């Protein structure tokens, strides 16, 4: 009778939970999972539980009572296991020497592969810092590098912007301590730390509200006095990088832009006060910020954790790094075996990143239901938080294809402020864009921007501006000469190897044969029509 009662009670509990969850599901819209397409081989079930009941909704007592007795279902581990990396043998329960080698090789490969993915944001920032120091000759925080003639394709930044005047700042708070950054009205952009985490915005979305001012960047662990009169921000790392930018309509180009920066921008340690700054025009200068796709990336990881405080990374990440021989405060000398594993891990991690970025399985990646345009910020925030977790695939999509973390490009800003980006790797038919073919994008009239819009073409191998005979692979509403308009005010932009007959050159972006390309639309100062989607861009269309 007691057994009958317990079964009857369990049945009532399962029914109640089923009805409760059905009610919940009817009122709450859930994100659809695309993972169902990636099925695993069927395995035998060891738990007999009603499939309509969400196990996560059950208390621990009900959960345990719903399972068969452990001793009934116990099955010892297998002596022989077939895996994708070979057969594993455990005669008598213990591994053979061959199995030990295979498992440790695979374990190290998996850990190294995941570390490459997890540390990609920090590696990307490390590449930015290295590229500026190595290729631009930056040797102190008081060197301000300016793309006074705009950023051309020689500057290999991930999906760099061809239309703005950039000011690149390399800050070293370990060397300089609290550092002052003076910015004028008309300059905007983020300051990001060595982990590529957002520190502060400058400009209309920053503390200066677009009026300019003095920012004081405080290093980790600093406990000294902080004077008044500054916009004070705290960084969790010593090394920081800023991508400030200005509209050429405000600051001009070339020498005019350099004059504006020299007269209005300064960077110096708080301790020393203003010191001599060096201003250099880096337009047309070759610079590579890309993360190595081989074992060198793991040397970068070692450099990162060696320079920054341990608190910037956390014990879990540092523990996984230590498991493959990368430990803070100790030499990093991988043997031939580990170098080979790290080379393979980098290749596999990059392959995963390319698939995640170019064919993302998250349905929230699409901006519009019936268009191919995607947002680099799938979560619509710069932290990649989704409720109580971090969307690690969304984070990888962004950092593998873009630079510069700021809420101003992700979160909904007031109409006319901030900027929003959209990208597509595919044409209207859902096929990847092919450099051997000819395409057209019609920018419909009345693009919803308070400032300007631009369309830029990138190389899927580097994710940087595509390198062709055009130094600036873009078309924009502020381009000179202006792109030709159709009678209704729309703009047709063409993508092909050669200029199509009868098409104005300012409406054409050159592509490369035998490789793909992808396209970004940038909206500067997006207005209400952008946010409420009463204006929707066309897809890129195949001509032939």
Residues covered by each model-derived region:
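Bacterial N-terminal signal peptides that target proteins for export
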Residues: 1-9
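Alpha-helical transmembrane segments
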Residues: 12-16
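C-terminal motif of bacterial Sec signal peptides marking the signal peptidase cleavage site
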Residues: 18-21
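A compositional/structural signature for long, glycine/proline-rich flexible linkers
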Residues: 35-544
